[in-house]
Amino acid sequence: MEKKFLTDFKEILEMENEEIHLSDNFREYEKWDSLAYLSLIAMMDEEFGVQIEGNEFKKLITLNDLINAINAKKIDGGN
C-alpha cells in the first residue's frame, strides 16, 4: 500500500524522478497547491476507499501521517 501511495503521490505532484521520504512535510514540496490537495483527496478515495475531511487533513504533516491516516480509515471502514 505504501509503495502504491508514494507512486501515486509523486504522479500528482509530477515528481516521478525525484526522491521523497516518509518523514517529508508534503506541504513543503514546490508543487504542493490547492489542485494537488484536491487530487490527493480524490486519489485516496478512488485508490484506497478512504475519505479524510478538511479538519482532519490539516493535522497531517508528513507523508507517513497520510499513510497512517489511510490505514486507520481502512480499518474503520473508510470514513
Protein language model regions, located:
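Two-component histidine kinase catalytic core, primarily the HATPase_c
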Residues: A36
